[in-house]
């Protein structure tokens, strides 16, 4: 949370959930991985951009979360913060223009398959640069209706909301990005059962 201090207000709700398993989807520099490791018995961190190194004592699953398990193209941008499975991603990094400089094929995994591998999560943080709706489409198991989610939305809050409704969530907390240079539609969504 060091890069997103305005999210600290939600920490008590994260701490209030069962503490067995947390997932950090889009781990990037590992800030959330480290914080979640202090709160949860197990943390699964996924980060497909190999420029992003995990914090000491942690490892990253290098797959990307998507609607289907298989392979997809990863669009690496000049800023690793903006790497995405989407060829066009205009939201994030303030008003800076970030170009795709390299494409790579990466393995993908659904949230359902992650649950089969690791067990059901109690908390899921998602920050995958616009691919949130596609990733959530791969969550169909009942366990995804019983956990807490914090999703960074990059202009797709309506689609994320539809996925959350499909999972049975009724009340969503929408957290607008407070930075004056934040792009329109750059926000977080927190839900709990």
Per-range role (PLM):
Residues 1-193:
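Phosphate/nucleotide-binding beta-alpha loop and adjacent structural elements of enzyme active sites
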């Amino acid at each position: 949370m060091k890069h997103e201090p305005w999210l600290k207000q939600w920490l008590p709700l994260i701490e209030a959930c069962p503490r067995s398993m947390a997932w950090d989807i889009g781990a990037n520099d590992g800030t959330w991985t480290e914080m979640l490791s202090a709160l949860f018995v197990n943390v699964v961190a996924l980060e497909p951009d190999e420029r992003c190194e995990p914090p000491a004592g942690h490892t990253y699953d290098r797959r990307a979360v998507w609607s289907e398990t298989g392979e997809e193209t990863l669009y690496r941008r000049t800023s690793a913060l903006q790497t995405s499975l989407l060829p066009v991603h205009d939201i994030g990094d303030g008003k800076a223009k970030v170009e795709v400089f390299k494409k790579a094929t990466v393995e993908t995994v659904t949230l359902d398959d992650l649950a089969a591998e690791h067990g059901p999560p109690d908390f899921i943080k998602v920050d995958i640069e616009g691919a949130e709706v596609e990733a959530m489409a791969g969550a169909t198991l009942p366990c995804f209706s019983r956990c807490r989610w914090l999703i960074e939305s990059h202009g797709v809050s309506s689609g994320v909301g539809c996925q959350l409704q499909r999972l049975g969530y009724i009340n969503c907390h929408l957290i607008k990005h407070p930075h004056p240079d934040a792009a329109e539609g750059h926000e977080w969504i927190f839900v709990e059962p």
